[in-house]
């Protein structure tokens, strides 16, 4: 099966194909938007029948579009997508690979040609060529592409630089998130890694380097205080080591076939003369890579996925700014169509099944039931009898999209946090490839979504996605201690610790599918009862800070352990300092 190739890894090389581009500017004012035309609801009134429906009560189930191609004469757009179930709203809204009569895109008066392009590098080249062609001929058909949100910093770093000769109007912008990976992208590892993350040190993970699924590994490792060796040619027994895979089937295949390679040993950052042979202990992959592991070898379980890191991987759509501003009304009408489609897919089983059927036609692979099954996600047993989770995606309605872009009621810009978090990680690990990346505000244009929200409040009536958080964490995904400074004998946080607290907040936002445990600890100086009370008061202070930054109160659990759980020797000053800590646990 062809695979979903994400945008981070080889993008710099591909963008070298861009040729000379001529300068120029056309103001969008002459084509300024008129009021976007509301999509027409056609269908019967019925009760939503899908689990966790976003529409409530006697909601309207829209009539499914016909299979006949639309001839509405509207703006033509080629939409490049990989085989990824997070795009179910687009499948439903378009009615087929080409816009069909009666579909939401037909009502929006656009004609969309959805093309499967699993090679993200080729999709990048298509965007670059489109910018050049549109510069020379404003009647050129539009080109959109949808990618993983966490991979965008590396993508934009290369693309923005390549398109600079065209001027600011021809830069790429991200304008809408239609859905997200919700479990299918994951790290699969031995059960021992899940039980004790420290056991992962010295282990190896096969993945596509600098890719979204590798980002899941990096977050899990960082949240557990584990180092990752960025050099896929060396071996560090005190870090998690990476084994480069060519794609998302190659990563699990290396595990399945018992792949091995020789590496130079690294100690404290210095390469030794000795060699060692390493195999594959774990994989970072996506569906169907996880299915292959389970069915062909087994022995690995999901230790972290986009089910837990629920904000990490939105399906973000981009185009060239000039085209978007020249066709603002079209863009807004398409956002309306995708938002309505998200509500339909979330609320009605026949709509979701229809999206699966369209997916099979677009991808020209499997059947609708296959894509529907892995959209929903499922539990199964692998060849060794272990329980494994496979697949899982989610569709956004307008409220979900607003929440992702920081336009929801809580004001938390989830995508900004995701973008900066993983941009910083890649820059830190690979400064020679990506020393910097474009500022979020330069490449994410919220104006289209803001306009739809302001002018069509009826589309905000669908319920946004909710997570039922555990009141007590029994399954830890990660645990990390922080040295937060308090006033002596007090729960008042010193200002110099605010940066640490903001780091905790951002990590919690990315891992939106998990509860946040805030556990206070002290050294053994003083009365045990007072220490226990102080540790809890300090944990409460951290909780209140997180709440002030937008983390829901029902997501946070607080405990104070006093001096009962030391991690270092209390007989030394250094040991006492380590024991005075706040432990952050992400779990369920």
Residue ranges, per PLM feature:
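Secondary-structure end/capping motifs
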Residues: 326-432
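N-terminal Sec-pathway targeting helices
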Residues: 2-15
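Hydrophobic membrane-insertion alpha-helices, especially the h-region
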Residues: 12-25
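Periplasmic peptidoglycan-binding/tethering modules of Gram-negative envelope proteins
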Residues: 436-515
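Hydrophobic single-pass membrane-insertion segments
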Residues: 22-36
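Periplasmic OmpA-like peptidoglycan-binding domain that tethers envelope proteins to the cell wall
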Residues: 521-588
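Pocket-lining segment of extracytoplasmic ligand-binding domains
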Residues: 147-151, 241, 245-370
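Short, glycine-/small- and polar/acidic-enriched structural segments
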Residues: 38-261, 265-266, 273, 281-287, ...
